[in-house]
């Protein structure tokens, strides 16, 4: 059975923050939880694509705009569960246990998980949303 989780990260000029974000996903990859990491990119001209490629993530070109990028990533995702994560956000160490617990105890229900760390705390836009595709 394939890993259940597709991680979708909308990006635009995210090279500075992306390495921390991707590194925070490693426990999930090591635990066999992550099926794929998809970067839905709105036209980055920095090293975003190179960083994603080096980490084994897939780049999907999208129209610019957070909603459009999230929708593009969701359409391309193959996982049973989707995790949306902003590039300037990194997950805390316990995220794998929290996600696994939710999947086991609340199948079919959307969830919003905290805490997370902002790479740039002055930005308050970061959010993490996890939901199951029916």
Describe each model-derived feature in a short phrase.
Residues 4-6, 36:
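Cell-envelope/extracellular polymer assembly enzymes that use nucleotide-activated donors
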Residues 13, 41-43, 64:
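Conserved short acidic donor-positioning loop in nucleotide-sugar-dependent glycosyltransferases
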Residues 13-29:
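Short, well-formed alpha-helical segments that are part of the catalytic scaffolds
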Residues 33-43:
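Short beta-strand/loop segment that forms part of the nucleotide-sugar
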Residues 41-49, 89:
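A conserved acidic beta->alpha catalytic loop
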Residues 61-77:
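Glycine-rich, basic loop-to-helix element that forms the pyrophosphate-binding segment
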Residues 82:
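Short aromatic/hydrophobic "clamp" motif used to bind/position activated sugar donors
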